[in-house]
């Protein structure tokens, strides 16, 4: 019996953890209706659009495709195994799966010598490179809600892409943190923080780019700015620095995916600010990102290998190349000769257009994008919809369980990868 079915057969709302955003909200529920799944208890646009990708409960189970033609699952597995066995340098991309799927992917990557890079890998590596170079103080959503009295959003307001974020931080509740947006002068005015909240939002504007603003704020916090700059943009940043020092618990929130190229430098400046503040008060950073399984795959690969993504299990050992092993660069340079793409949470991110042999494990809606010769498509279940699973939340230290809403009749990514691994062993024999 699924989470939405009662013993009487009536379909009712059930508690649900939303897998469509790295916040992994678990405070609302889902109803199964004749035409699909309906969100209850929230107006989150990301959750609604994610649920809209799934049709009626009675939808037929789609067939796998080989060269665009329907086939049985075993034929698709055999074709995918032949592609990977013939490849001298495969690329595993997308990586939109849960913990079990990532654990099954790692031994396959080791066997084939694959390079692994998730969708949005550049954003993920911004934070990882800063962490590797200088370390970081980070926090959790619960800590922000219970302790933070000043939240500074860097560059943009997260609620535009994470609609539930400010509610998760307790914004609008009595005695909670103030929100400050650090934003360039050229940016458009921000929308209200939370519907029905009159507190509004404080904005500190600066001229120039975010690199300059982050560096200047770090200098102000460290007390390295003289009086001669007090009347310009540094004056506003100096006032913000004073507020950061006066706060009991300040949190700097940023979205790696919204940072420009070389955004690692901005994150390093933010980490310096947090480190300086922690000498006399409490402060932390909170990066928002790693959705579509990216942070989960990175966590799994790190604990299994000791190295993050953009790593290859080569004959000489593990190679971690955060710049050279960028999926887009590898495809553009034709440095790889086969692509395995995993996208189990929806039709985005779609596999990149390429004439290389492709194996796609994905949401059934991706079938139309995987046609033609040299392609294999295997539809898989979505964790949190058709199967149970686990994902790491954006704050990195919280592993959230996902409960299936219904049985969609599809295999999980972990099951498909396990069968593919066995087929490869048979090919080698």
Show the residue positions of the predicted features.
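N-terminal export/assembly segments and adjacent metallocofactor-ligating motifs
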Residues: 1-220, 256, 422-429
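N-terminal, charge-rich interaction modules
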Residues: 10-27, 259-260, 288-306
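Intrinsic-disorder/low-complexity coil detector
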Residues: 14, 59-63, 307, 378, ...
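Short low-complexity stretches enriched in small and charged residues
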Residues: 46-49, 103-113, 310-320, 330-338
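Short connector loops at secondary-structure junctions
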Residues: 113-134, 282-309
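Non-catalytic alpha/beta scaffold blocks inside enzyme catalytic domains
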Residues: 128-281, 313-429
